[in-house]
Amino acid sequence: CYLSEDHMLGARENLRLLARMNRLSPHPCLQDRKDFGLPQEMVEGSQLQKDQAISVLHEMLQQCFNLFHIEHSSAAWNTTLLEQLCTGLQQQLEDLDACLGPVMGEKDSDMGRMGPILTVKKYFQDIHVYLKEKEYSDCAWEIIRVEMMRALSSSTTLQKRLRKMGGDLNSL
């Protein structure tokens, strides 16, 4: 399983798209800020084993895709940029699917992998609850856009770490 340079370029492009999706000055939204507790698994990949890292990356990208693919999302963003972001996230997921398949086949019920994944799911569940509580307001979406930039930036850092270790995720 190899994450190509194209995969890494796609990750950077997704960050650029998120930056371009900015519609509001962040100042009026400052009172809506919340610490969602970005999971350390997404930030500090050195504590993860190979199969955990792949699973965490996949789950984070899947949850991010799901977040921007909900009905309320299309009302908040430029449709073209949103579609490009979702397409880019989908491509990254497909790239990781090639890595995830063998890992899942080896230890499908491995609870060591489930802890970090559940942490990522809880993180995104908190984001969905926040959006609902804020009635999917423009400010709430702006807060989430910035949060997703942090999350995707962290995932890109983790992907770079994995790639530097020989470029082959299976050799970690």
From Swiss-Prot:
<dbReference type="GO" id="GO:0006959">
    <property type="term" value="P:humoral immune response"/>
</dbReference>
<comment type="similarity">
    <text>Belongs to the alpha/beta interferon family. IFN-alphaII subfamily.</text>
</comment>
<dbReference type="GO" id="GO:0005615">
    <property type="term" value="C:extracellular space"/>
</dbReference>
<dbReference type="GO" id="GO:0007565">
    <property type="term" value="P:female pregnancy"/>
</dbReference>
<dbReference type="GO" id="GO:0002323">
    <property type="term" value="P:natural killer cell activation involved in immune response"/>
</dbReference>
<keyword id="KW-1015">Disulfide bond</keyword>
<dbReference type="GO" id="GO:0009891">
    <property type="term" value="P:positive regulation of biosynthetic process"/>
</dbReference>
<keyword id="KW-0202">Cytokine</keyword>
<keyword id="KW-0372">Hormone</keyword>
<protein>
    <recommendedName>
        <fullName>Interferon tau-3</fullName>
    </recommendedName>
</protein>
<keyword id="KW-0635">Pregnancy</keyword>
<feature type="glycosylation site" description="N-linked (GlcNAc...) asparagine">
    <location>
        <position position="78"/>
    </location>
</feature>
<dbReference type="GO" id="GO:0002250">
    <property type="term" value="P:adaptive immune response"/>
</dbReference>
<feature type="disulfide bond">
    <location>
        <begin position="29"/>
        <end position="139"/>
    </location>
</feature>
<keyword id="KW-0051">Antiviral defense</keyword>
<dbReference type="GO" id="GO:0005125">
    <property type="term" value="F:cytokine activity"/>
</dbReference>
<dbReference type="GO" id="GO:0002312">
    <property type="term" value="P:B cell activation involved in immune response"/>
</dbReference>
<keyword id="KW-0964">Secreted</keyword>
<dbReference type="InterPro" id="IPR000471">
    <property type="entry name" value="Interferon_alpha/beta/delta"/>
</dbReference>
<dbReference type="GO" id="GO:0005179">
    <property type="term" value="F:hormone activity"/>
</dbReference>
<dbReference type="InterPro" id="IPR009079">
    <property type="entry name" value="4_helix_cytokine-like_core"/>
</dbReference>
<keyword id="KW-0325">Glycoprotein</keyword>
<feature type="disulfide bond">
    <location>
        <begin position="1"/>
        <end position="99"/>
    </location>
</feature>
<dbReference type="GO" id="GO:0005132">
    <property type="term" value="F:type I interferon receptor binding"/>
</dbReference>
<comment type="function">
    <text>Paracrine hormone primarily responsible for maternal recognition of pregnancy. Interacts with endometrial receptors, probably type I interferon receptors, and blocks estrogen receptor expression, preventing the estrogen-induced increase in oxytocin receptor expression in the endometrium. This results in the suppression of the pulsatile endometrial release of the luteolytic hormone prostaglandin F2-alpha, hindering the regression of the corpus luteum (luteolysis) and therefore a return to ovarian cyclicity.</text>
</comment>
<dbReference type="GO" id="GO:0051607">
    <property type="term" value="P:defense response to virus"/>
</dbReference>
<dbReference type="GO" id="GO:0043330">
    <property type="term" value="P:response to exogenous dsRNA"/>
</dbReference>
<dbReference type="Pfam" id="PF00143">
    <property type="entry name" value="Interferon"/>
</dbReference>
<dbReference type="GO" id="GO:0002286">
    <property type="term" value="P:T cell activation involved in immune response"/>
</dbReference>
<dbReference type="GO" id="GO:0060337">
    <property type="term" value="P:type I interferon-mediated signaling pathway"/>
</dbReference>
